[in-house]
């Protein structure tokens, strides 16, 4: 049984004070970690406040990015080794905003995945197609290629433990949501790609999230789908009430 995982991705929002207030507002109302894993991915500047205030609760903490080296002359980068030392659980990599604005390549994302595992953290690897690619009928091929490149040379055991987030670029922050059927269709492609690269056992264990205008109004329908194990949620994760509705979608 795959444990559902709902992760809020704050992007470049919230300061440490707001972070502390947010955690205090949600931490006593989270589902048991065995029921639904509740995660917040926060900017690096907010991680200390997030970790400090989440202590003793079921809230898991994710960084929104890291570098593929542990230390050195890499001005402005975040060390995966230090993230682990701080107590971070997950690292989001390959988000379409990182690929688009900061020119991250599939190779960069694969190197980061290896660095994250090397340091005992778990990656949440994002993939997804543009509207242009979808309209050209190439969404499935595009996503399969992204997943294949991201997982290069990872062990079966590593892949079984990671999270892959399918985020159609055309549905991020646009108010357009892929229908639950569209989301399920590509999440199934993600799982099939893992099965083709590894085997059915690994594919059955990997958790696949859908991201792209996920909100309390549509989370239940999405989570009912066979191949959708969670959500990577942007805007709706910035408000304690809506975040709690998302992570407690079973109730």
UniProtKB/Swiss-Prot annotation:
Reactions catalysed: D-glyceraldehyde 3-phosphate = dihydroxyacetone phosphate
Active site positions, chain numbering: 95 (electrophile), 167 (proton acceptor)
Sorted UniProt keywords: Cytoplasm, Gluconeogenesis, Glycolysis, Isomerase
Record-listed substrate binding positions: 9-11, 173, 213, 234-235
Protein's cellular compartments: Cytoplasm
EC number assigned by the record: 5.3.1.1
Residues spanning the signal sequence: none
Entry-linked Pfam families: TIM
PROSITE patterns linked: TIM_1, TIM_2
GO MF annotations in UniProt: triose-phosphate isomerase activity
GO biological process, one term: glyceraldehyde-3-phosphate biosynthetic process
Annotated GO CC locations: cytosol
Pathway: Carbohydrate biosynthesis; gluconeogenesis; Carbohydrate degradation; glycolysis; D-glyceraldehyde 3-phosphate from glycerone phosphate: step 1/1
InterPro entries: Aldolase_TIM, TIM_sf, TrioseP_Isoase_bac/euk, Triosephosphate_isomerase, Triosephosphate_isomerase_AS
Assigned protein family: Belongs to the triosephosphate isomerase family.
HAMAP family per the UniProt record, alphabetical: TIM_B (MF_00147_B)
Subunit annotation: Homodimer.
Chain's role: Involved in the gluconeogenesis. Catalyzes stereospecifically the conversion of dihydroxyacetone phosphate (DHAP) to D-glyceraldehyde-3-phosphate (G3P).
Name of the protein this chain belongs to: Triosephosphate isomerase
């Amino acid at each position: 049984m795959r444990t559902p995982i709902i992760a809020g991705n704050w992007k470049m929002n919230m300061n440490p004070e707001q972070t502390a207030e947010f955690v205090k507002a949600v931490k006593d109302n989270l589902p048991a970690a065995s029921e639904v894993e509740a995660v917040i991915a926060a900017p690096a500047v907010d991680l200390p406040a997030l970790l400090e205030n989440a202590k003793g609760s079921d809230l898991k903490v994710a960084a929104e990015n890291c570098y593929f080296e542990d230390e050195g002359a890499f001005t402005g980068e975040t060390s995966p080794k230090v993230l682990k030392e701080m107590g971070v659980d997950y690292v989001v990599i390959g988000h379409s905003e990182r690929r688009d604005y900061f020119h991250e390549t599939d190779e960069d994302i694969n190197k980061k995945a290896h660095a994250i595992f090397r340091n005992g953290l778990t990656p949440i690897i994002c993939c997804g197609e543009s509207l242009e690619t979808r309209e050209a009928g190439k969404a499935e091929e595009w996503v399969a290629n992204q997943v294949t490149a991201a997982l290069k040379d990872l062990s079966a055991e590593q892949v079984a433990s990671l999270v892959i987030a399918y985020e159609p670029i055309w549905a991020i922050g646009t108010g357009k949501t892929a229908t639950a059927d569209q989301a399920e269709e590509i999440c199934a492609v993600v799982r099939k790609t893992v099965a083709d690269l590894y085997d059915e056992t690994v594919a059955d264990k990997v958790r696949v999230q859908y991201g792209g205008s996920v909100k309390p109004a549509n989370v239940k329908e999405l989570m009912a789908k066979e191949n959708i194990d969670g959500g990577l949620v942007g805007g709706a994760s910035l408000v304690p009430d809506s975040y709690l509705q998302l992570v407690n979608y079973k109730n």
